[in-house]
Amino acid sequence: MLIKTGDKVRVIAGKDKGKEGTVSKVLNAKNRVIVQGVNMIKKHQKASQTNPQGGIIDIEAPIHASNVMLIDPSNNEPTRLGVRVEDGHKVRFAKKSGETIDK
């Protein structure tokens, strides 16, 4: 998967289409990502010692990686990603602008 933790992405499909956020976690086995502030769900939390009150909390649910696109840092537009070899290392680059994402 080409999307990594810390990438700024835009949702391109689903109920949160158009929203932007930062990837907080990548679930490689399921090909999903968790984006801050996107795909919020309500979880019914049982009371425990750490949370004595319990109740309903809002958390981010995973979203499929195909439903997000990386925001190109050079022009702030969504772009597809590619991989090329520079100085013997694989680096990601933006297909739209051709600029390297990983420094």
Swiss-Prot record:
Keywords assigned: Ribonucleoprotein, Ribosomal protein, RNA-binding, rRNA-binding
GO molecular function: rRNA binding; structural constituent of ribosome
One GO BP annotation of this record: translation
GO annotation, cellular component aspect: ribonucleoprotein complex; ribosome
SMART domains per UniProt: KOW
SUPFAM superfamilies (UniProt xref): Translation proteins SH3-like domain
Record-linked InterPro entries: KOW, Rib_uL2_dom2, Ribosomal_uL24, Ribosomal_uL24_CS, Ribosomal_uL24_KOW, Translation_prot_SH3-like_sf
Pfam families: KOW (PF00467), ribosomal_L24 (PF17136)
Family note: Belongs to the universal ribosomal protein uL24 family.
Subunit structure: Part of the 50S ribosomal subunit.
NCBIfam families associated with the record: rplX_bact
PANTHER family in UniProt: MITOCHONDRIAL RIBOSOMAL PROTEIN L24 (PTHR12903)
Purpose: One of two assembly initiator proteins, it binds directly to the 5'-end of the 23S rRNA, where it nucleates assembly of the 50S subunit.
Protein name: Large ribosomal subunit protein uL24
Organism: Levilactobacillus brevis (strain ATCC 367 / BCRC 12310 / CIP 105137 / JCM 1170 / LMG 11437 / NCIMB 947 / NCTC 947) (Lactobacillus brevis)
Taxonomic classification: Bacteria, Bacillati, Bacillota, Bacilli, Lactobacillales
Gene name of this polypeptide: rplX
